[in-house]
Structures are given as C-alpha cells and as structure tokens.
Amino acid sequence: MISVRIGGAAVRIHFSFFVFNALIFLMRSSSLILSFYGVCLLHESGHLAALKLTGGRISSVDISGAGAVINTRKGGIATAKNRLIVLLAGPAANIFAYLMLSLFGCHGKFPQLSLIAAVYNMLPYHSLDGGAIVSLFSVGTAYERAVNSILTAFKMLVIAVSAAAAYFVGREAFPLFAASLALFTGDIARRR
C-alpha cells in the first residue's frame, strides 16, 4: 500500500488497485482506458462536490481495485439526508454527463461508460454507493437481517449470471464475472 497525505487527508492506494489496472491495460484499448478514468474522476468529483456543499470534510481516501472510498471526519455530514445526498451525487454526475453528451449527439465511449458507472455504483454491494445507501436505511433496524439475506441471494444470482455470460460470450464478459466475485468477496470480508 502507498500512503500519502494531501491537504490533511490520508490517501491510501492499495495493491489491488494496481492489479486491477494491469488487467484493464491487458484487456482494453487506450481510448477506452482514458474514458474509464475520466468517468471515475467525474463520479468521485460528484461525491466531493456534494460533500463540500453539505459541510462535510474528508479524513481519508482509500483507492483499491473495487474503487475509491471517501471517509469523512466526525461532525461533517451527520444527517442521513446529507449522507444520502453525497452517496447519490456520484451516480447523478455520471447520469447528467450521459444525458448532456447524448443530447448534443456524442454517443462515444465516455457517455456509455458514464451511464454504466452510474448503474454499477448503484448495485447493493457495501463498497459501492448502492450498498452504502441500503446500509444507511437498514443497519440497526428490525429489517437488517432480512435485507442482508435478500442481498446475499441477489449477489449470488449476479455471480451466476455473470459466470454464464463469461462462458457463453467469452473474454469480453469476463470482467463482469471477476467484478461480481470480487465485490461479493469484499462484502464477506467486511462482515468479519
């Protein structure tokens, strides 16, 4: 892990980020890679802008193969409403970019990846925005256990479907399988 401080916030880049990048560079074209990183930067900028607007402050940023996690300082975005705004801001930035670029006739890789990133980040995995939103409303409630059971079944279905896609479609669909397996494994590790 590489760790630096930027503006008082700890920024940690985990080994899995470098492994993920190596796989991307092996399997994809350079224009797709640049679009991918642009979409990721746009997504995280949406979160950061909302965090700033709601009075939150960053304590650390963890960058791994599963994505980026922005941790806030205590006393920042304390209300559930503000946390929800910050969590939705990343996917909203991606959807806004997709709509604006499509409106002006740009139908290339960047708008497509932007829409995919918005949908992907709303999946109910703990390391993604969708999972954080589910946790925001279910942790500590009487429904927490039932919600976790339903989500586990959903995640296993996603793994099965992505494995079938990788088998029938081939190499192009393999990243879907790898991502669904990595996200599920991350959720299991997080529970321990």
Q: Model-derived features: where do they sit?
A:
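Hydrophobic transmembrane alpha-helices and their immediate loop junctions
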Residues: M1-R192
